Amino acid sequence: MVKIQVTPDLSIGDGQPFALIGGPCVIESEDFCLKMADQIRQICDRLQISYIFKSSFDKANRTSIDSFRGQSLEDGLQTLQRVKEKIGVPVLTDIHESYQAAIVAEVVDVLQIPAFLCRQTDLLLAAAATGRVINVKKGQFLAPWDMQNVVKKLEQGGAQNILLTERGSSFGYNTLVVDFRSLPQMRALGYPVVFDATHSVQMPGGKGNSSGGQREFVPYLARAAVAVGIDALFMEIHENPEQALSDGPNMVYLSQLEAYLQQLLAIRTALAW
């Protein structure tokens, strides 16, 4: 498995420290992102965990037309740039259309391909052409071994730094389940694997005009993933998920984050990952 260089000071993969990709689901405001990024960074610093801040400038796949989507592309990138400069952490955000790739890559360290879009060839090639690290969420509809075709598209587009993320599979209506076999199966493709612990407990469209979630199961799934073996954990975090503007039901409380991460590090240490 290759080692992915996110910044000169942060690598993910073979022999590298455990990494957290985390932050609020959507950019609610610049001040809020700065506060969240700073507090999460402090936790990660105490635990010696590598940290990448995550938030979306646009939630283009919300259940309802009336749901909050985020800031504009320009304002969102300005917020992410401020997080990089003031908090001193690399940043990740997702793109939904090919034209966004080059623009967003001017600011972020990691481009994320949403699960619903993981087979979109033009989007993958546009992301690959930027030279940035690319984190691809495995589609809820996709077998883990079928991610080899996603990887081939990215490689043929010139991408060398790829992360593959498990975020659950559709199980009937409004429900996801996690098949942890997917983690070693995707790692066998030669790239680091990430587990998305919060979207894996999402209940897509489960509240009628928005998605539900079962955040109480996040720590259980995260512990299982670390025991199986992952290189990074993806987790959406909010100081008050009940008031969050997107994905509140599956985001974890900031106040609980450090305890969760301590448990995960203990498992990694016990298994000598």
Curated annotation (Swiss-Prot):
The keyword Transferase appears for this protein: yes
Please name the GO terms that the record assigns under molecular function. 3-deoxy-8-phosphooctulonate synthase activity
Metabolic or biological pathway: Carbohydrate biosynthesis; 3-deoxy-D-manno-octulosonate biosynthesis; 3-deoxy-D-manno-octulosonate from D-ribulose 5-phosphate: step 2/3; Bacterial outer membrane biogenesis; lipopolysaccharide biosynthesis
Name of the featured protein:
2-dehydro-3-deoxyphosphooctonate aldolase
Catalysed reactions, semicolon-separated? D-arabinose 5-phosphate + phosphoenolpyruvate + H2O = 3-deoxy-alpha-D-manno-2-octulosonate-8-phosphate + phosphate
Q: Which family does it belong to?
A: Belongs to the KdsA family.
This protein's encoding gene: kdsA
Q: Which class of enzymes does this protein belong to?
A: transferase
| One annotated Gene Ontology cellular component of this protein | cytoplasm
